[in-house]
A protein has these predicted regions:
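Active-site helical microenvironments for divalent-metal-assisted chemistry
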Residues: 2-197
């Protein structure tokens, strides 16, 4: 399934992730299956058009933030992190919901769908925060881990407009959500924001 050259950073991130679940062969198999799907979906895509940064690395980092930094050991949550962008409209090689449900299970699929129903660009900050705060804590973890990785990777970006937009959105939307979700996430987001200066 993975014929094209895989970047060393991708391999290392995937190995780090699997090591966190090495006590359960079922978890390793399920996470590997999700990674294979994500690899197909994101093949040829690069994060922020940086040719040295395959998009799949972003999804792996989100999974690692959850599993390693936040100590989330639920494989369905990790699968949802790996596949959180599976339904991006810009992708031509997206998987259908029914096929994903059969492959990764209903819980993981529902987590993915729960994280994608909030469109930050179409809502006011109060409305967005209220809707996200009504979701489960684990959905908020997924949303915040995604934002945390996006902020961390931006410190290497030359796009000042994107940096300013993400800083503003994080301040208005994500820090208030993190404040009502997990102090550790507030700290991590605040540090990442500070490092953008």
């Amino acid at each position: 399934m993975m014929k094209s050259r895989m970047y060393d950073s991708t391999k290392l991130s995937f190995i780090r992730l699997l090591k966190l679940f090495e006590d359960s062969i079922d978890d390793v198999v399920a996470i590997t299956r999700a990674f294979s799907i994500a690899y197909v979906i994101h093949r040829g895509k690069f994060y922020d058009n940086i040719k040295s940064e395959p998009y799949i690395n972003h999804t792996l980092r989100v999974a690692l933030i959850l599993a390693n930094e936040l100590k989330v050991k639920d494989r369905d949550v990790i699968i949802a992190a790996i596949l959180h962008d599976a339904f991006e409209k810009t992708y031509t090689n997206t998987f259908k919901e029914e096929l994903l449900k059969k492959t990764i299970g209903e819980k993981a699929l529902n987590l993915i769908l729960s994280t994608t129903k909030f469109n930050i660009k179409e809502m006011e900050s109060n409305e967005y925060c209220k809707l996200v705060l009504k979701s489960s804590q684990i959905v908020r973890y997924l949303i915040l881990a995604n934002r945390l990785d996006s902020i961390r990777i931006l410190k290497n970006s030359i796009r000042k407009d994107k940096i300013q937009r993400f800083k503003k959105e994080t301040q208005e939307y994500f820090l208030p959500i993190a404040n009502l979700t997990d102090d550790n996430l507030v700290f991590k987001l605040s540090v990442a924001m500070y490092e953008l200066k």
